[in-house]
């Protein structure tokens, strides 16, 4: 499973990339607003750090405008994937952009039927939001299971399942066990994956024991 980082914070992206686990990046208007930077300058800098798919989101609502915006975003860098909101207009735009060879990531997917439409339209990625479904007492991971089952039934579907709205390491583990193609993770979840209380306790004990190990005497200084 590939890991993308869900962030527009360049320093977070640098730190996660240094861990060797980041295969791509997803951004959205909310993340850009959080860092207070413009879309194009941020995407260009991210592309200079991570050599992988970088999702940049359209904010138009009509198909014609989404297509125009998508073309503009795709020109920023070869690694840009155009993020399209789910819906009738989004499907029209996805089909058109795909026909032009522009990669797409359909976002805000909350049902298997929506994911089926994304595959039919030729989307590169579909982004089901598991955390937001959990928030309303639905099972986000059950949706991932259903989408994967449907996609595996049809060999001609090439759309990758990009698990989004990931809240914790359990979501990551569940996505990996189900065989999702990608999970996009906030920086704090990436760091949580590396931690375990028994690891911390073991390191603490090893360091304490090391202090008890006799050390070789330093050779006398040359005169």
UniProtKB/Swiss-Prot annotation:
The keyword Transferase applies. Pathway: Carbohydrate degradation; pentose phosphate pathway; D-glyceraldehyde 3-phosphate and beta-D-fructose 6-phosphate from D-ribose 5-phosphate and D-xylulose 5-phosphate (non-oxidative stage): step 2/3. GO terms for molecular function: aldehyde-lyase activity; transaldolase activity. Gene3D superfamilies: Aldolase class I. The active site is at 83 (schiff-base intermediate with substrate). GO terms for cellular component: cytoplasm. CDD domains: Transaldolase_FSA (cd00956). Keywords: Cytoplasm, Pentose shunt, Schiff base, Transferase. Its EC number is 2.2.1.2. It is an enzyme of class 2 (transferase). GO terms for biological process: carbohydrate metabolic process; pentose-phosphate shunt. Belongs to the transaldolase family. Type 3B subfamily. HAMAP family: Transaldolase_3b. Transaldolase is important for the balance of metabolites in the pentose-phosphate pathway. This is Probable transaldolase. It comes from Myxococcus xanthus (strain DK1622).
């Amino acid at each position: 499973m590939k890991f993308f980082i869900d962030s527009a914070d360049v320093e977070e992206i640098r730190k996660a990339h240094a861990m060797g686990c980041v295969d791509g990046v997803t951004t959205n208007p909310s993340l850009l607003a959080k860092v207070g930077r413009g879309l194009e300058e941020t995407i260009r800098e991210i592309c200079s750090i991570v050599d992988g798919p970088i999702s940049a989101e359209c904010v138009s609502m009509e198909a014609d405008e989404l297509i125009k915006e998508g073309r503009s975003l795709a020109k920023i860098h070869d690694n840009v994937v155009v993020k399209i909101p789910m819906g009738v207009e989004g499907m029209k735009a996805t089909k058109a952009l795909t026909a032009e060879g522009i990669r797409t990531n359909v976002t805000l997917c909350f049902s298997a039927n929506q994911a089926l439409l994304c595959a039919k339209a030729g989307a590169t990625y579909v982004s089901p939001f598991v955390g937001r479904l959990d928030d309303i007492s639905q099972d986000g991971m059950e949706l991932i299971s259903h989408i994967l089952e449907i996609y595996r039934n049809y060999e001609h579907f090439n759309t990758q399942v990009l698990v989004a709205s990931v809240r914790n390491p359990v979501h990551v583990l569940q996505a990996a066990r189900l065989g999702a193609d990608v999970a996009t993770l906030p920086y704090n979840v990436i760091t949580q994956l590396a931690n375990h209380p028994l690891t911390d306790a073991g390191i603490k004990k090893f360091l304490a024991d090391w202090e008890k190990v006799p050390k070789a005497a330093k050779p006398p200084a040359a005169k």
